[in-house]
């Protein structure tokens, strides 16, 4: 992915990422409209400015940690939720007529909510920012190098074996994660004392 033109900016109302698009940019106008009108939760919405035929996209940075700094230990439940969120724009983007090749896979610009473990991505609807399938697969594989699953390390080994098999299909990977999620029994909810005092 093209990393040219990314700039962090601070303002009184928060932090922003600005991306100045090339002068002769070819935008995906359908994607621009979709994101402005009904942006999916896994993407950051953006504003656009056009000054002297130079278009700049401006994304407000959420109160979350950059994937670049996200590492450590996860329970299997947390990891499966986290990884399912990373896959979401690549397997569900077409539901919004979005091409997953334009989802930014640079870890600095992917934001993970510390509470929900869900990720938000930048979508850059311009041809020069298009990822190859190999770049997307490398991104998803490299995330595994930053984490450890404390209660099922064999599952990480299974994922590594899948990637090293060489025939990675995003929908198959998503199905693998969903299958593991269905095997994990939900934690019981603590019930309070429901007896009423007389």
Language-model region placement:
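Short, Lys/Arg-enriched, disordered terminal segments
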Residues: 1-12, 188-198
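Conserved structural core of kinase catalytic domains
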Residues: 2-83
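Catalytic core regions of nucleotide second-messenger enzymes
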Residues: 51-55, 96-101
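"Short basic amphipathic alpha-helical interaction patches in structured regions
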Residues: 71-75, 93, 97, 122-125
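Short amphipathic alpha-helical segments
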Residues: 78-86, 132-136
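Short C-lobe core helix of eukaryotic-like protein kinase catalytic domains
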Residues: 84-95
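A short glycine-rich, hydrophobically flanked beta-strand micro-motif that places a catalytic Asp/Glu
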Residues: 98-112
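C-lobe/activation-segment region of protein kinase-like
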Residues: 113-197
């Amino acid at each position: 992915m093209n990393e040219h033109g990314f700039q962090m900016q601070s303002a009184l109302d928060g932090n922003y990422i600005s991306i100045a698009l090339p002068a002769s940019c070819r935008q995906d106008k359908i994607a621009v409209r979709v994101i402005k009108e009904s942006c999916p939760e896994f993407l950051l919405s953006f504003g656009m400015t056009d000054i002297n035929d130079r278009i700049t996209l401006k994304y407000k940075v959420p109160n979350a940690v950059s994937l670049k700094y996200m590492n450590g230990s996860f329970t299997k439940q947390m990891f499966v939720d986290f990884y399912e969120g990373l896959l979401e724009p690549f397997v569900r983007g077409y539901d919004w007529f979005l091409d997953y090749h334009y989802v930014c896979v640079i870890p600095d610009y992917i934001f993970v909510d510390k509470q929900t473990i869900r990720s938000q991505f930048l979508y850059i609807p311009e041809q020069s920012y298009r990822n190859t399938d190999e770049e997307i697969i490398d991104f998803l594989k490299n995330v595994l190098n930053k984490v450890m699953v404390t209660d099922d390390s064999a599952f990480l080994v299974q994922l590594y074996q899948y990637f090293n098999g060489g025939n990675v299909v995003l929908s198959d990977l998503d199905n693998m994660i969903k299958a593991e999620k269905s095997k994990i029994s939900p934690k019981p909810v603590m019930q309070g004392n429901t007896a009423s005092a007389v």
